[in-house]
């Protein structure tokens, strides 16, 4: 089926089993595996009436195209993965924290950003449909399960989505080396959507024009930039830190 895509490894498969088991079409388990993690997968799959097939290592290697699968591969129905941004925003119990990826095309970077987003409690990751990496097996593997837990929402018109976020009272904060304030000397808003630009070119002009703030990340060494997932982790962590301090003062 065109909507099916593989996921592999215990992190990705277990996260999908617990978060969205109805989207799993079938699982393949390596013959002879009987360790605790494999038994857990088999038990959960049986409870959810998911088809399980046992296959040799060569078959699993072929399915995963040589990637490290740990003896477990699944196929999911990607059409059951869709999440609406409005539903996310209207069902939050705290101010929204979003991550916007403007043209991140490397699946390894997307996977790392999703993993970072999960760790920092990001409510959704948003990206334009064009010129962005899509969810695939590589992304799921790198994300270590976060691709199954963090809503990844692609939009046809990013500028329009940014305007809609502002209507919810969410500040759009861009990361830029020439930002008017640096990360450690700015008072960050409670409701925030951080924008990370393309690995090579940064944010697109129209995206930049929709930002309410431009913030730079201080650099103390000789390199001029960091991996996008590292930068995302820094700004999201600082946002969480400031929230904690504000709550302690209440």
Swiss-Prot record:
Its main location: cytoplasm. Pfam families: SpoU_methylase, SpoU_sub_bind. S-adenosyl-L-methionine binds at residues 197, 217, 226. GO terms for cellular component: cytosol. It is found in: Cytoplasm. One of its GO terms (molecular function) is RNA methyltransferase activity. Its EC number is 2.1.1.185. It catalyses: guanosine(2251) in 23S rRNA + S-adenosyl-L-methionine = 2'-O-methylguanosine(2251) in 23S rRNA + S-adenosyl-L-homocysteine + H(+). Keywords: Cytoplasm, Methyltransferase, rRNA processing, S-adenosyl-L-methionine, Transferase. InterPro entries: 23S_rRNA_MeTrfase_RlmB, Alpha/beta_knot_MTases, Ribosomal_eL30-like_sf, rRNA_MeTrfase_TrmH, SpoU_MeTrfase, SpoU_subst-bd, tRNA_m1G_MTases_N. It comes from the Bacteria. NCBIfam families: rRNA_methyl_3. Belongs to the class IV-like SAM-binding methyltransferase superfamily. RNA methyltransferase TrmH family. RlmB subfamily. This is 23S rRNA (guanosine-2'-O-)-methyltransferase RlmB. It comes from Neisseria meningitidis serogroup B (strain ATCC BAA-335 / MC58). The gene is rlmB.
């Amino acid at each position: 089926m065109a909507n099916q895509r593989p996921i592999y490894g215990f992190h990705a498969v277990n996260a999908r089993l617990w978060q969205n088991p109805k989207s799993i079409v079938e699982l393949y388990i390596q013959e002879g595996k009987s360790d605790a993690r494999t038994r857990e997968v088999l038990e959960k799959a049986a409870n959810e009436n998911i088809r399980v097939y046992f296959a040799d290592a060569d078959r699993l290697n072929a399915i995963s195209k040589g990637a490290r699968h740990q003896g477990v591969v699944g196929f999911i129905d990607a059409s059951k993965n869709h999440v609406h941004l409005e539903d996310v925003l209207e069902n939050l119990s705290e101010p929204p924290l979003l991550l916007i990826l403007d043209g991140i095309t490397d699946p390894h970077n997307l996977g790392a950003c999703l993993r970072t987003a999960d760790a920092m409690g990001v409510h959704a990751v948003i990206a334009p449909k064009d010129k962005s990496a899509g969810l695939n097996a590589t992304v799921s593997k790198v994300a270590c399960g976060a691709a199954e837990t963090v809503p990844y929402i692609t939009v046809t018109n990013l500028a329009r989505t940014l305007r809609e976020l502002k209507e919810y009272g969410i500040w759009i904060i861009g990361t830029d080396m020439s930002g008017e304030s640096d990360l450690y000397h700015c008072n960050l808003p409670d409701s925030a959507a951080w924008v990370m630009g393309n690995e090579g070119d940064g944010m697109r002009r129209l995206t930049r024009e929709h930002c309410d703030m431009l913030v730079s990340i201080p650099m103390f060494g000789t390199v001029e930039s960091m991996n996008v997932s590292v930068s995302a982790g820094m700004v999201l962590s600082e946002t969480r830190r400031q929230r904690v301090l504000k709550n302690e003062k209440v």
